[in-house]
Regions:
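Glycine-rich flavin
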Residues: 1-121, 154-158, 164-176, 181, ...
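Rossmann-like NAD(P)H-binding beta-loop-alpha module
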Residues: 119-156, 160-161
Length: 190
């Protein structure tokens, strides 16, 4: 998503062509998702080819451990298979956190996953939470011209990251017109 936004907005070329440069005027959600799909397919192919070149087996399946070194694979349309290995890497991905105090409805209030179902880019948005995903979405949508306000109860973004890096991140976020509301709690939604 980030790479698609950087490409479509022309952000990386602005130091050459000026701050108003963009690859496409009036970027739509369809443009963003189309470019995101292209980036994902391309990057997936690169990683898959690198893994295969290095003799690593890949299996897309539901897996469960039989014992410490054996995995049972269940794939649609194929027989159940067992694989034994000294080392196993489990890549499950992540799910969006859902604060129980926030009434996610998929219409006005979205998780990061649901944001990808938008038909149009919003004119403005508030991002609740200054963790990795919140910061990523705030910066992506700001680059696309959306007015973004990021609210976080903590006094500093990404507390596990070096201060100099965060200072640079905050500078660039503000430069892209992200409003930061740190050390503030969301008490209600309108």
């Amino acid at each position: 998503l980030r790479e698609a936004a950087l490409y479509l907005s022309g952000y990386k070329e602005r130091n050459v062509y000026g701050d108003s440069y963009s690859v496409k005027e009036n970027i739509t959600m369809a443009d963003l998702l189309r470019r995101t799909d292209y980036v994902i397919r391309t990057e997936t192919d690169v990683v898959r080819n690198q893994l295969l070149r290095n003799g690593i087996e890949l299996h897309a399946a539901h897996a469960s451990f039989v014992d410490a070194h054996t995995i049972r694979l269940d794939s649609t349309g194929t027989q159940q298979q067992q694989i034994t290995s000294d080392k196993v890497i489990i890549a499950t991905g992540t799910n969006a956190a859902r604060d129980t105090h926030i009434p996610f409805d998929g219409q006005r209030i979205f998780t990061s996953d649901e944001m990808l179902n938008l038909e149009d880019l919003p004119r403005a948005m508030a991002v609740i939470g200054g963790g990795v995903i919140g910061v990523e979405f705030a910066t992506i949508f700001a680059i696309l011209g959306v007015r973004v306000t990021l609210v976080d109860a903590r006094p500093r973004l990404l507390e596990f990251v070096d201060t100099e890096i965060i200072d640079s991140l905050v500078y660039n976020m503000r430069r892209n017109r992200v409003t930061l509301r740190m050390a503030e709690k969301v008490t209600g939604l309108e």
